[in-house]
Each structure stands twice: as structure tokens, then as C-alpha cells.
């Protein structure tokens, strides 16, 4: 179903795209966040897409600014991507703004897009956090069409985690939703942490495979991927397989929901795939996640599985 919504967004007219993807003047302008260790040359990328199929726009000049000063200029290729190199000298957050020059555009250029380089030492502790039904209280469809709310306590707990760790938003959302995702996070008071998204092809492969691929990529540079937080049990398996702690914030069917009993049983069955391990914690809500992470509260998969089965019996 999510794939159908994504296709509708990409193939729809400018009105549909504006609602679903936050396009501007028939253009979608993407700027990709990244992580890097100090002293390594990296590539900063921004992409211009446009038209009914959101094709890459070739031959446009994209200016990259840092601290309000022009850093470099690059021209978009056939895929609409403009790329420049940058070498962060020391750990810290390096903020850039990418801007499309108006020359060659049929309409006014889209608004500038922010790009973050989070430079960290290779042994810096990282926390990977999903967005939908984890930070955002709704699923993919509501993100495209509505104004979803944050999960209760999510911002507070993430701020607490960020005092000693680097937060990375690792979302299964495709990069087409990057501008909308960043705007939502800012509008709801979340700190500016790197947002890693994937291609449409990666989206279609499924969340677990997508997360596993990103983890493998990050592990080539960063040795302390500490915690993964999300709503999907399958994602937790990807985190655990890579030696991380996994905190599953279950997407519980609300009381009175249609087929609630079947959904509770399905969640309980899925939890069988997680062994009771001090690194696997299953909770309901960010307040419980906070206790599991900071206070060592025991939240084993088997206990949650039994709770789900007990709830199902009462339906």
C-alpha cells in the first residue's frame, strides 16, 4: 500500500505533488545529509527534480553556502544531482545551504535546502531512530496527506539521548520525502540531527533489508552503533544481528479497533523471532523506552508477548 501512495505522489500532477511531497513551483529540491569522520573528503549532494514524473533536471547551477558564504558551485547531471567535495577538519556539525540558480528554470526556483554534515569520531556512540510510528505518531499515508503529531515523550527522550550520543534519523521513507520530513521535524521542535533516507528502489525492498544495508554502510566507518529504536520487529532483528541494542516501540492496535484480537495475536507471533536478550527490549511508548534505556528496566520480548496474548483473550 505504501508503494502505491509513493507512485501516486511521483506520477501525480503538480497539485498532488505539492500536497504529498512539498514540491515548489513544480520542482522538488533535495539536499542529502551525511555522516563523516574527521579528515575524510566526502561528497555533498543536492538534486533537482521536476515535472509529472519528477525527473532529474540537467544543466542547472546549484550553489552551496556555508555560514552564509558561497562555498562551491556545481552543475546538475542527467540525474539532476549536483555534487561538491568537502573535508571536515574536526568533529562537529557542519551546516550547508544549497540553492538552485534561476537560470535555465521555467519557473521560480525552489526554496533553498539545508544539508547537514555530522562529523564524528569513528568510535562515537550512534543511536538510529525510525520516524513513522516511532517519532511520528502516524504511518506513511498520514505523512503524505495529513499533519501527523509526534509520539508522546519522543522529543524529550531523544534530547536526553543526544546529551551523550549522536542521534541519526534512519527512515525507510524514500528521499523524495526528505524536504517534508525535515520540515515536520523542525516544525515540531526536534533538534537538527542527520536524516538518512533511501531511494525508491530501496523503499521497495522492505524495511529490514533497507536498514541492514544502511547499518552495513555505517559500520565501515563507525564502530559504536549502539541502539536502534523503531516500531518494526523486523527492524529489531537487523539491529540485533549487528550487535546493537534494539528498542521496539510496539504499534499497538487501539481499544475498539477492528480485528484488534487478530492484530494482537499477530504481534505476539512476530515477537517469537526475538530471543530474550538484554539487548532486545520491547515497550509500549517512549516513557517505557526511557526506563529501559536509562534505568535498566527489564522489557524482554517474552513478557510483552504474554501481555499481548492476555489482551487478545480479553477481546
Label each residue range with its predicted role:
Residues 142-167, 178-179, 209:
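Short, acidic loop-to-helix structural element flanking the phosphoryl-transfer center
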Residues 16-23, 143, 174-315:
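C-terminal cap/substrate-recognition subdomain and adjoining C-terminal extension
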Residues 160-168, 218-225:
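Short, surface-exposed connector motifs at secondary-structure boundaries
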Residues 6, 12-114, 314-315:
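Intrinsically disordered, serine/threonine/proline
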Residues 125-140, 239:
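Asp-based phosphoryl-transfer active-site loop
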Residues 136, 167-168, 246-250:
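Short hydrophobic alpha-helical runs that function as membrane-insertion/retention elements
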Residues 107-125, 131, 144:
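Short beta-strand elements
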Residues 1-4:
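Bacterial N-terminal signal peptides that target proteins for export
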Amino acid at each position: 500500500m505504501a508503494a502505491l501512495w509513493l507512485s501516486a505522489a511521483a506520477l501525480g500532477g503538480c497539485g498532488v505533488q505539492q500536497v504529498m511531497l512539498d514540491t515548489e513551483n513544480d520542482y522538488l529540491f533535495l539536499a542529502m545529509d551525511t555522516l563523516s569522520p574527521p579528515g575524510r573528503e566526502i561528497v555533498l549532494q543536492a538534486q533537482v527534480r521536476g515535472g509529472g514524473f519528477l525527473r532529474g533536471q540537467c544543466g542547472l547551477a546549484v550553489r552551496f553556502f556555508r555560514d552564509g558564504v558561497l562555498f562551491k558551485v556545481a552543475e546538475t547531471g542527467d540525474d539532476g544531482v549536483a555534487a561538491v567535495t568537502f573535508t571536515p577538519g574536526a568533529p562537529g556539525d557542519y551546516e550547508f545551504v544549497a540553492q538552485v540558480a534561476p537560470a535555465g528554470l521555467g519557473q521560480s526556483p525552489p526554496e533553498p535546502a539545508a544539508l547537514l554534515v555530522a562529523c564524528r569520531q569513528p568510535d562515537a556512540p550512534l543511536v538510529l531512530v525510525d520516524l513513522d510510528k516511532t517519532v511520528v505518531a502516524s504511518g506513511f499515508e498520514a505523512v503524505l496527506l495529513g499533519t501527523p503529531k509526534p509520539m508522546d515523550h519522543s522529543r524529550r527522550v531523544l534530547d536526553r539521548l543526544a546529551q551523550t550520543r549522536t542521534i541519526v534519523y534512519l527512515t525507510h521513507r524514500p528521499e523524495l520525502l526528505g524536504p517534508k520530513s525535515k520540515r515536520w521535524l523542525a516544525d515540531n521542535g526536534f533538534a537538527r540531527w542527520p536524516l538518512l533516507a533511501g531511494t525508491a528502489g530501496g523503499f521497495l525492498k522492505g524495511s529490514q533489508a533497507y536498514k541492514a544495508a544502511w547499518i552495513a554502510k555505517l559500520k565501515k566507518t563507525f564502530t559504536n552503533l549502539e541502539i536502534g529504536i523503531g516500531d518494526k520487529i523486523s527492524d529489531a532483528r537487523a539491529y540485533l544481528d549487528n550487535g546493537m541494542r534494539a528498542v521496539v516501540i510496539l504499534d499497538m492496535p487501539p481499544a475498539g479497533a477492528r480485528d484488534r484480537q487478530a492484530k494482537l495475536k499477530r504481534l505476539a507471533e512476530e515477537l517469537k523471532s526475538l530471543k530474550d536478550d538484554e539487548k532486545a527490549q520491547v515497550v509500549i511508548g517512549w516513557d517505557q523506552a526511557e526506563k529501559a534505556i536509562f534505568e535498566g528496566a527489564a522489557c524482554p520480548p517474552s513478557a510483552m508477548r504474554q501481555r499481548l496474548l492476555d489482551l487478545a483473550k480479553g477481546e
